[in-house]
Amino acid sequence: MSLFDIEDIKVKPDIVCTYPDPTVPPDAAIVIDNGSYHCRAGWAGKDVPSLVFKNVLAKPRKDRSKKDTSEVVVPTVQIGNDITNIEAVRFQLRTQFDRNVVTHLHVQEQIFDYLFGRLGINADGCVPHPVLLTECVANPNYSRMLMSELMFECYGIPGIVYAVDGLLSYRMNGGQDSGLIVSCGYQATHVIPVLNGRMVEDKVRRINLGGFNMINFMFRLLQLKYPVHVNAITLSRAETMIHNYCSFAYDYTESLRNWALLEFYEQNVIKIQLPYNQNVSAPTLTAEQRLEKRKELSRRLAEINLRKREEKLAEDKVLLTRMLAAEDTLDDEDNVGFTLHEFSVKNVDEYRKMIVTLRERIAKTTQKMNSQQTNNQPEEKPLQLLQPPPNMTIEEWVIETRRKRDEILDKKQIRKQRKQDLAKRRTAAAQERMRIISHLAKKEKGVDDFGMRDEDWDVYKSISREGDSDSDAENEKLIECEEILKQHDSTFVEPVVAPGNIAEFHQLHIGVERIRVPEILFQPSMIGVQEAGLTGTIDYVLKLFPKEDQVKLVGNVMLTGGCANIRGFKERLSRELQAILPFQSVYNLMVAGSPSLDAWRGASQFANSQEFKQSLITRQLYDECGGEYFKEHTASNFYYPTPSQVSSALNDTFN
């Protein structure tokens, strides 16, 4: 059992890099790994990217209250690491991706502006460097065409090369001519077969699951488990928990059985301490202090009542003076109706009766106020102190009361400990319970007289899991003892709630969720996705090839992508491969050296190769052949021309 403080992701805004970079050639290419989770950008030939940031932007909504002002206010757009608190702008986040395909080019343009600006490129209206840009497997021609149009028309780049991130990572890790790539991304997971140095694109398969689904699953599980802490459980914190504490189970079914055991749970559960404000408890008041406090409250209440009486008395006197002054008009028939209406009475008799009532009320209130002034102290009921029996002194009575209280607390603690012991399998209490049960079961069948004797109740209590419960009489006796000690024992301290209990209330227990969340990659049905898991997809892809090619593929299986960082992935997939391959098959499984970063590193190496120069789509080719023109290479998608009917329909739609 381990306790950890919650870790909130803290990012620092990116600085503007020096341009031109003295460590790279003047014509060096810009390498951009445009992932749906992180964007990594830097110069070709370097080992690490210059920029790594979340591939999102936050655009605040316009303030509608200022729509009538003549001054145009443009909301500030935050991009990448400029978003220091992503949860504060969660509902304002925008991304250029629809799953893993770039579809929102206006968002992509703003992110590229941020990227080139942070790289320090300050050329006049253009980016004078070729670009290597990653794209998803089987990226649609139309999406690539819009990206080329953005790059050439908006940024004026001299050339661009498109490559698949999984193939670049495979290349970085010394990929052989044949192998099987399992690329686990943020939005999707791809199984990519490679034969003779090229991807077999028509046999690639995709699972619509990735890191995003794991984060969302953990987020919903914890909110369902701890509804009282629903505001403290955020997507960012769920993401951190997956990175730090989750792992793939080698045998998921067996792991579930282990987590059902209390001992295993207590040894392996992760406790996450949420932030909370600890209220400082007020000091315990003595009997004299409580009495003084009651007197003070009574005095304040008396002052409030006196003030109300004075206000009411003044109102009554003013009303009586007005009525006496208007009494002479009652004999005038012309004014009597107006006078009665003014004082809301029906006739003259009711008017005179109201005057008598006011005089009596004024006299009574004045008399009560005079009596209070003579005796300012309100009458207090004496504090009823509990007294000892006639045959005991107070000191003896306090000692005896303390002893009784300790006995009651000891009994309650013994019952609590016994319940905990019975919950475990190998404790002495649990073994004694099983011995008694087995002894009772050995008795011959006949007349069941268990319970006829008083001793049977003791046997029942000894084998009952619940044990004795705290009786009401016992609790009342405990309260009485504590009240006596409060009044007569100056050393007695009233028990208060320990701060540790408050801290435990603000803890999250990450138990079976540690293996349950990553398991969705192998069992998508756990979150309602009707697709095959990773094992079934790999098995399906392998069966698309003849046996001799299957041997080549399983001889070099590589895991890459952010999800490959989760512990136990290699061991679990190795077990699954052993189950689906023929008996005594030989296979080799490896994890990329840096699953998250190797795609950019492979792109950095590729951008320095001769193949990059041969695969470059230049501005001249773009102008001559159009935005759909594409050059294939060993780390790229295959080019399939868009049918003419579809092309004409797209042109009619967007022209």
Curated annotation (Swiss-Prot):
InterPro entries registered for this protein in UniProt: Actin, ATPase_NBD
SMART domains for the chain: ACTIN
GO CC, any one term: nucleus
Any one Gene Ontology BP term: chromatin remodeling
Annotated spans, Disordered: 368-387
Record keywords: Coiled coil, DNA damage, DNA recombination, DNA repair, Nucleus, Transcription, Transcription regulation
Keyword Magnesium: no
Residue stretches in coiled coil: 287-314, 346-377
Compartments reported by the entry: Nucleus
Signal peptide: none
Keyword Transcription: yes
Function (record text): Proposed core component of the chromatin remodeling Ino80 complex which is involved in transcriptional regulation, DNA replication and probably DNA repair.
Assembly and binders: Component of the chromatin remodeling Ino80 complex.
Family the UniProt entry places it in: Belongs to the actin family. ARP5 subfamily.
Name of protein: Actin-related protein 5
Organism annotation: Aedes aegypti
Originating gene: Arp5
